[in-house]
Amino acid sequence: MMSLWIRIFNWFAKITGWLPFLLAFRTKVRYVDKSIQNSRIKGPAIIMSNHIQLFDYVVYLFVFWRRTIRTQAAEVLYRRPMLGPLLKQLGAIYVNRETRDFSFCDESVKLLREGWVLTIFPEARLPRDGEVRPLPFKTSSAYIALKSGVPVIPVVTNGSYFNLKKRAQVLIGTPVMAADLVEEGKTEKENLRIVSEKFRGIIRDMAEDLARRTGDESFLVREEKKPDEEEKTN
């Protein structure tokens, strides 16, 4: 019964929020591979994205409008008077970063095995000014992807919302299976770190790709090259 209500509320939010979304976000969607442009997500999947603004999840509700999109939300969001109840109605998974409670991982795997689409922001928080983006990925994202065995759709946003001069830009990549990123001979713990880093690399490369396509690098904060690395590139 709760699953049905989540689907109904999700669609209610999309229908009532469609016009405000068009006016406030003005999102242009691009694809790494244009052959998948008109395809829809079939079956369970993880939408794995960089995290620039609080509204990233809202944008994906409309970008992937054909499916009911669920997400993970930190405890700080649930404490907000209006936002907390809204996230609950949308079926968000509660993540308490203040404790070592990883039950959200198993809950995420359970939802994916039931056929849902889940948005994950592996950085686990918004970046601060000057921090290299994307932030290091939490290994919990790799665990969920490996344990569930569902395809991961990498997505990048420039986070340009509520901006009349510059449109929001979203780049959708080709699906990736986490199992294909595992390295033989490594322990499970090592592979969680390896897979997380590989996913981060995919998102980082896509962010660079989006910047090239749009001519806008304002959402990028790159790692400074060491002197010896600069000599090699010169």
Report the location of each language-model feature.
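Membrane-anchoring hydrophobic helices of lipid-metabolizing enzymes
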Residues: M1-I46, F55-V59, Q89-A92, V170, ...
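Short, glycine/polar-rich helix-capping loops at beta-to-alpha or helix-loop-helix junctions
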Residues: A13, Y78-L83, N163-K165
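Structural motif corresponding to alpha-helix initiation and N-cap regions
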Residues: V29-V32, R80, F102-C105
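A generic structural signal for well-ordered alpha-helical segments
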Residues: P20-L22, F64, L87, L111, ...
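A conditional alpha-helix N-cap/helix-loop micro-motif detector
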Residues: E98-D101, P134
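Catalytic core of membrane glycerolipid acyltransferases/transacylases, capturing the structured
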Residues: S39-T99
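Non-catalytic C-terminal accessory region of glycerolipid acyltransferases
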Residues: L4-I8, C105-N234
